[in-house]
């Protein structure tokens, strides 16, 4: 879980607090973001990257570039990689944990 991953990263020194969260769709559907074009989407949410991606309607917003963290050793077998491939993205750059995908 995200909490377990955070405990590893922060060596168990975390405090759990409940907050209200919104999906990207909920944020982008607000009036001031209507018809908003996303050129570059950078997601760094300490292990919750897939949840964030699942909260975006890719068919509507179509970000040109998406940067996400993938911690699995075999990138092409990760859930996030396959999620983005299925949304018509290709991997164009990989760092240690950060990976950049481009819309086809």
PLM region spans:
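Glycine-rich adenosyl-binding loop in Rossmann-like folds that engage adenosine-containing cofactors
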Residues: 1-22, 26, 31-33
């Amino acid at each position: 879980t995200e909490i377990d991953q955070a405990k590893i990263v922060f060596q168990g020194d975390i405090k759990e607090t409940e907050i209200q969260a919104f999906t990207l769709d909920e944020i982008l559907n607000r009036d001031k973001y209507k018809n908003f074009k996303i050129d570059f989407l950078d997601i760094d949410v300490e292990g919750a990257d897939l949840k964030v991606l699942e909260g975006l309607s890719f068919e509507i917003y179509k970000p040109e570039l998406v940067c996400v963290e993938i911690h699995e050793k075999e990138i092409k077998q990760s859930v996030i990689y396959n999620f983005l491939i299925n949304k018509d993205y290709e991997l164009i750059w990989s760092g240690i944990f950060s990976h950049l995908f481009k819309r086809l």
